[in-house]
């Protein structure tokens, strides 16, 4: 894909139940509102999406209850990648709907990165011996480099499989890195983080992306700039301090895009509020995007939602109410971006 900025995408998760009908509905809606690179609707938790199928083929990895995982011993990396059905869904859907395929520039897949996956796996007693507790109250796999490295190898093969499907943007979502890297790094070295991320991304030959939530420290920014990632994807609406962290030269000197979160995804209920009360107006979004253009340059920007919308399912009593908020936010984001092209 040539260097062309100011295209639109989204992070992935949507606030509706994980059904085939909802997958079809959400993907179609993303295309029809004008998202340039729609992501497959991520309708299950980002960690169990990969850890659950892995627990069925990695014997020491157990899912003791839904979304709770324990590792008890060393393990062999599986021979075949797991969780490919989401990419296959997009490929098959667009084959069946060529009219919709003609309306988009490409597709996006959201995968979960090795550090974040490892942070969600608890260690059994044998593996946790001698490890000091930091950040977490329990021993977790992220504290052991060899486990993180194995997860990177696993995600590399999943990324390669998605790349081979022809998916254009493939993101390794790594929200835990915002906690891991502040003024200093917990558990690992800078070189290990760069090497591990590059390994996880190495199967992706199109547009590898990394999504990290929250405030980005200058140290984390500099680490990510040294990786092979092409798109650095961060929250700006919720964490406006990130405007002070990134400069245009960071992107141009390192040949990166900045995916700028433009609509807020972390919401609190307001008494008596309707759907539109939660949705940013087009004029507001035009001004917000213009701020990014002035700072970073139109050709260096990707416009997207702050994070995924999946958490809204718990924020509001009605799934349909939450879903309409998400879709209307994205629609206004697209309209604002098109007016600034």
Predicted regions and their residues:
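Domain-level signal for soluble alpha/beta catalytic cores
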Residues: 1-341
